[in-house]
């Protein structure tokens, strides 16, 4: 299964509480921090809601 490399580009400060919780749940801490997440529907749904804050790359 493919993995997604998620990088936080913009700060989650001054965002809606739901968006801050999603950033925290994905394991992103600071700007420019990256995590690997599985490529599934649940992850893609979370990424869609904070798409304006992140950059996503597919990793094999």
UniProtKB/Swiss-Prot annotation:
Please provide, in alphabetical order, the Gene Ontology terms of the cellular component aspect for this entry: cytosolic large ribosomal subunit
The record's section on InterPro entries has: Ribo_uL30_ferredoxin-like_sf, Ribosomal_uL30_bac-type, Ribosomal_uL30_ferredoxin-like
Q: Which domain of life is it from?
A: Bacteria
Report the Gene3D superfamilies cross-referenced here: Ribosomal protein L30, ferredoxin-like fold domain
Q: Name one Pfam family in it.
A: Ribosomal_L30
Q: Which UniProt keywords apply?
A: Ribonucleoprotein, Ribosomal protein
Q: Which GO terms describe its molecular function?
A: structural constituent of ribosome
Quick one: a GO biological-process term for this protein? translation
Quaternary structure, per UniProt, is: Part of the 50S ribosomal subunit.
Concerning its family, UniProt says: Belongs to the universal ribosomal protein uL30 family.
Classification via NCBIfam families = rpmD_bact
**Protein known as:** Large ribosomal subunit protein uL30
